[in-house]
Amino acid sequence: MRRPVVMGNWKLNGSKAMVTDLLNGLNAELEGVEGVDVVVAPPAMYLDLAERLIKEGGNKLILGAQNTDTHNSGAYTGDMSPAMLKDFGASHIIIGHSERRDYHKESDEFVAKKFAFLKENGLTPVFCIGETEAQNEAGETEAVCARQINAVIDAYGVEALNGAIIAYEPIWAIGTGKAATADDAQRIHASIRALIAAKDAAVAEQVIIQYGGSVKPENAASYFAQPDIDGALVGGASLDAKGFAAIAKAAAEAKKA
């Protein structure tokens, strides 16, 4: 059985006090919780503080990050390299998020390049895919997701997905309070796994596929009850220790062997 992964994307939120309170709270809430990997991705300038607090808390959490560059050094003002992220203990790196694709005009091909560079540097890509509301209403969800995934497969082979995480996030559900139903999310997750299985069944069977988009303690269990939903990429709800821990506990409970 695939081990669920629940990841908190803090986006552009945080302060020293907030990071300290949130991670101390999570360390307490997750005491004794097993069967789930819990990852947090704070803003880059708080990675050092987060790494120290995670260690002090007994390493119940895994440190992640929200972005990477496609170089490890050089004249790339404002960017972060995989080598730098590793130096701070970050292992799970979000790429392809709709906010990066939209605000920073990151193409499928550029996201695929980031994906490959993370793998080359021994890090775990958390590869976000998903459709807009207009694409959803036009019945294009599966085609959009396939296009985004195939940008990686066509350039680097289906084997590149080994050890990676795919996060299906319908753009219309991110931070809106709207959410795909558990049945609808399962249908898309199953189509993603089938797309990969058509090329390599073993890769498809092991790849983690998270759902993201207004996941909350109140609805988390319904998603995790689905066979192809292997965790969640959580936004706003990850900024509350008790609520985020409840989501992680729901994943652990639902995916018990």
UniProtKB/Swiss-Prot annotation:
Keywords: Cytoplasm, Gluconeogenesis, Glycolysis, Isomerase. It holds the Pfam family TIM. Substrate binds at N9, W10, K11, G175, S214, G235, G236. The active site is at H97 (electrophile), E169 (proton acceptor). It is found in: Cytoplasm. One of its GO terms (cellular component) is cytosol. Homodimer. This is Triosephosphate isomerase. It comes from Vibrio cholerae serotype O1 (strain ATCC 39315 / El Tor Inaba N16961).
